[in-house]
Amino acid sequence: MPFCQVVVGPPGSGKSTYCFGMYQLLSAIGRSSIIVNLDPANDFIKYPCAIDIRKVLDVEMIQKDYDLGPNGALIYAMEAIEYHVEWLLKELKKHRDSYVIFDCPGQVELFTNHNSLQKIIKTLEKELDYRPVSVQLVDAYCCTNPSAYVSALLVCLKGMLQLDMPHVNILSKADLLCTYGTLPMKLDFFTEVQDLSYLAPLLDRDKRLQRYSDLNKAICELVEDFNLVSFEVVAVENKASMLRVLRKIDQAGGYAYGSTEIGGDAVWVNAVRQGGDPLQGISPQERWIDKKEEYDKYEWELEQKSTMDEDENEG
């Protein structure tokens, strides 16, 4: 029963960086994993790529041959993957014992409106018994701008409904939050997505948005009515935050409650089942803004102690 992450999000949200960071983390805890690049327009891949869609699809050639723009070419490419999904199935069968991370294109409509990505993943579920979790990244910078945050909420909600699978939303680049100045609300407000009516006065301060006051209010009410969207907070370079989000993903997809034979990381799975997060109960505001340096040091000391304990046990 293979498990996978389907990593989506708008351009600049840090998808490829996250994929590489997650791959490194999984390797560190002993879980066999691979990254699959599904973005034919991704020209700067820094991670080891087990399956690369660019080997069979050239987005520049698609633009030239079919007189399409960049967005149209990506839609065409995704439809081509869907139509020729047997190629992807064949490649994935070579890695049946690996946990898979899919790095998807950043074109928003591919995971909010278009059906090809969803159909591809559904085919993997049916043919290879995959257990996917959609991981949607949003740049934490949106928390500095209420209108950008409302837009991110709507994209996340639409993505969750469109992809129709277990879903984890992430505010990425959390380590930069302390450099943005004072946020309009505490970070906890943005992660919990509760009482969005408090955003209305902030949105109305911008004269350009006052004419859209009713629309913004309706969007906030819509998000609250569904009560589906919330965010985890991640800094890829911070191992502890990546471990926390992996714990959430494993719980969402069922990895933490199933067999450990595929991943080979029984120690990690048992830890997830038992809990044990040393910073459990610490608010995102406190961790990433109010006392960031203090908790950075604390987590570093914990990691050093853990490394020393492992060395002693091996000795």
From Swiss-Prot:
Predominant cellular place of this UniProt entry's protein: cytoplasm
Span(s) of short sequence motif Gly-Pro-Asn (GPN)-loop: 69-71
Gene Ontology terms, MF aspect: GTP binding; GTPase activity
Key words, A-Z: Cytoplasm, GTP-binding, Hydrolase, Nucleotide-binding, Nucleus
Catalytic class of the enzyme: hydrolase
Residues that coordinate or bind GTP: G12, S13, G14, K15, S16, T17, S172, K173, A174, D175
Pfam families: ATP_bind_1
GO biological process, one term: protein import into nucleus
Domain of life assignment: Eukaryota
Signal peptide bounds: none
GO cellular component terms listed in the entry, alphabetical order: cytoplasm; cytosol; nucleus
InterPro entries the UniProt entry points to: Gpn, Gpn2, P-loop_NTPase
Function (record text): Small GTPase required for proper nuclear import of RNA polymerase II and III (RNAPII and RNAPIII). May act at an RNAP assembly step prior to nuclear import.
Family (UniProt): Belongs to the GPN-loop GTPase family.
PANTHER family: GPN-LOOP GTPASE 2, XPA-BINDING PROTEIN 1-RELATED
Subunit note: Heterodimers with gpn1 or fet5/gpn3. Binds to RNA polymerase II (RNAPII).
UniProt protein name: GPN-loop GTPase 2
Organism: Schizosaccharomyces pombe (strain 972 / ATCC 24843)
Gene: gpn2
